Structure formats: structure tokens, C-alpha cells
Amino acid sequence: MVGHVTRTCAFAAAVAITAACASTAGLRSAHLDAGETKFYAAPLAVVGPAARQAVLAAGLNVDTVSTPDSLTWMIIAKKGMSLFSYGELVRVVVAQTPDRAVAVRVYTKRRLATNVTAKGDWSGPIFQQLDLILHQEN
């Protein structure tokens, strides 16, 4: 009886931990307007590559870069595990808006929801790097 309860509790804990884990697939399928947003007056053809550079300069590793459509870039990046963190996933969406401005949205997910030592929001460092890169190109 005790063994059955222990196995049941272990299974329940494993399911809870797995369910709380973020994945790149989950990040890709989140709404494109999720996250912190900043608008830029530069063209999409300039902001897209600059956003990728900004992600790298912020200390993240780029996993994939895709274009869901002709007016949108999606960058998926990761911050690896460390002594104090299980890591994080970051999605940057760069999209042309109808008024010709380019919206950059940064959405961050902790790999494990209970990971309180993770940064939690990479928008500040990414926007800071993007501002520097775009300012240098002007």
C-alpha cells in the first residue's frame, strides 16, 4: 500500500513538473502580440536582422529564426541552465504594422514555472541592444 502511494505521488509530481515546463513549441504557438512591445520607425528589412543581433548581444542563444509570413519575423532564443536557474525561453516577434511602423515584441517564459531565480523578462536588455544597433546603423 505504501509503495503504491509513493509511486502515485511520484507520478503526480512528475506530471506537475512536466506540465509546468515551457517548450519552444508552446512559445511558437503563443499569440504573436504577447509580451512587451516597442515600435520602431526603421523598415522591417532592417529591424528583423537587428533584432537577431540584439538577442545575441543580450546574452541569449538563438535557436530558430523564421518568417511566419512576409511581414513577420519570429526569433526563438534560449538562456541555458545555470547553477541558479533551469533556463529560459525567449520569443521575439518583429512585425510590420499597417501604419508602417515595425513592432518588436519580446515574450519570455521560464523553462520551469517554479524557477524564481530566472530573469523572467528579457525585453529590457533586448530593447536596449536593439536601440544601440539601430542607432549605429543611422
Question: Where are the regions that the model predicts?
Answer:
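Bacterial N-terminal signal peptides that target proteins for export
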Residues: 1-10
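Flanking scaffold residues of small Cys/His-coordinated metal-binding clusters
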Residues: 13
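Ser/Thr-rich, low-complexity intrinsically disordered terminal regions
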Residues: 22-138
